């Protein structure tokens, strides 16, 4: 069966990231003893969806010109995550965990827009990508012996967001053609909920849903057309949202 490049990259990422941890778990190393007995590590596969409330404003003072667009922009992809955490059970049924995570995704959203009037014709192509995320989260929960651990998730995430594309204009106003690209690291809050089921003494499986809300993505640029008119363009995605559905497996040091 053929796997596309993004899926192959994610599988390789999980393999090379996760394998050293299995080796550490099996050998008596200083790090191995440091991790016992309340730590765990694991990996998840991810299906994620991004939402961008995107606006583009363009002005030219020389032409007394203003143009704007508003798109409900979406992206989706597959990803992989590795995580390392520390947990404690108290008062029999209560649970608290602290977890660091790092994930890689093929998430991408493309858009094509054509605008034409008596003054100009424009073609706009663009792509939003979110490839890397990392962060720290707290897991408060409750343990039900016959079911598993129900937990919430509150954390902080950093996401690598890229906007790239091209714009081409022709008409009496003047013509121009160019590309743009900008990458920013955006912080945000992460909220989620999940369920962990015990498979063996050391192994658990996990199902989780996370909702991430990021800082505004703002990208300003300037350019000139063939008539030497200057244009100022502001692109903004208001608080991008990244939803993640995760299915994972983890190992407990016990």
Spans of model-derived segments:
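K/E-rich alpha-helical interaction surfaces of small helical-bundle regulatory domains
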Residues: 186, 190, 194-218, 240, ...
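Extracellular/periplasm-exposed beta-strand and loop segments of Gram-negative cell-envelope proteins
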Residues: 45-77, 104-133, 158-186, 214-244
């Amino acid at each position: 069966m053929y796997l596309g490049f993004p899926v192959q990259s994610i599988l390789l990422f999980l393999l090379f990231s996760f394998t050293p941890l299995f080796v550490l778990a099996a050998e008596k190393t200083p790090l191995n003893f440091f991790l016992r007995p309340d730590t765990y590590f694991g990996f998840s596969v991810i299906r994620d969806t991004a939402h961008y409330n995107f606006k583009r404003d363009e002005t030219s003072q020389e032409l007394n010109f203003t143009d704007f667009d508003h798109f409900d922009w979406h992206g989706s992809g597959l990803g992989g995550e590795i995580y390392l955490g520390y947990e404690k059970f108290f008062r029999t049924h209560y649970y608290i965990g602290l977890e660091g995570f790092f994930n890689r995704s093929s998430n991408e959203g493309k858009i094509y827009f054509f605008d034409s009037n008596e003054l100009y014709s424009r073609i706009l192509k663009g792509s939003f990508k979110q490839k890397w995320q990392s962060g720290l989260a707290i897991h408060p929960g409750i343990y039900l012996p016959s079911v598993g651990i129900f937990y919430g998730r509150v954390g902080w995430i950093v996401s690598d967001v890229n906007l790239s594309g091209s714009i081409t204009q022709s008409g009496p106003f003047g013509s121009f053609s160019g590309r743009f690209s900008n990458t920013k690291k955006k912080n945000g809050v992460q909220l989620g909920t999940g369920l962990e089921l015990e498979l063996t003494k050391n192994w658990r499986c996990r199902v989780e849903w996370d909702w991430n809300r990021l800082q505004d993505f703002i990208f300003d640029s300037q350019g000139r057309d063939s008539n030497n008119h200057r244009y100022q363009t502001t692109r903004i995605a208001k608080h991008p949202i990244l939803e993640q559905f995760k299915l994972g497996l983890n190992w407990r040091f016990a």
